[in-house]
Amino acid sequence: KKNSEKFTCLTAYESTLASVISENGVDVILVGDSLGMVVQGHDSTLPVTMDQLIYHLECVVNGNSGSHIMADMPFMSYSTDDLGLENAKRLMQAGANSVKIEGGEWISNMAQALSDRGIPVCAHMGLTPQTINRIGGHHVQGRDPSQKEKIINEAIALEKAGAAMLLLECVPGDLAKEITSTLKIPVIGIGAGIHTDGQIMVVHDLLGISCLDTPCLLYTSDAADE
């Protein structure tokens, strides 16, 4: 980020694609709970378990040749600090280089607890699929002024709590740009415009093989502004 260099991130769930992705210079591989939708065929990420995530993580680790591997912490796997620490430990022992958790300021304690123990954390904000039942679907987040201010303040709080990275999903490009310029940590975007430090896509969407009515999500550039 200090050198204004962009970086790339793709999801992977098994060894062969992980090998191809890594050998072609993708900086970060996310073993995401999106596997619940694109691999298992569910209509959300909620059914994915820790054991399933770890299985796919181990497959990706076996195919990786140098990319940073980030692993999602599935739904309710960090509902308490003790549970979150135990599950993050399992992911790191299985080969992850960092873990990703979803939420706003309420995950600050979890982010700090993990960071204090040497576990790099990516905080996922904006459209957070694990809260899809509360937010009512795949809708752009941060369009109205109060919501925009809330997201900015929570991003700052998460950085202060020790988050090493931030992922912004499906927010307006101007909001993502402001957060990226405000924070010192790298910001990854998906459907959040072109001004974030990095971009991420679900590999099935990139390859055009997703069978979902709503790909995870549209994200070639700035879906939130369209």
Task: Kindly give the residue locations of the regions a language model identified.
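Glycine-rich nucleotide/cofactor/substrate-binding loop typically near the N-terminus or early
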Residues: 71
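Generic N-terminal amphipathic, Lys/Arg-enriched alpha-helix
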Residues: 1-5, 217
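Short, intrinsically disordered, charge-balanced linker/junction segments flanking boundaries
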Residues: 212-218
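Conserved small/polar residues in nucleotide/adenosyl-binding loops
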Residues: 219-226
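Alpha/beta enzyme core
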Residues: 7-9, 13-42, 46, 50-68, ...
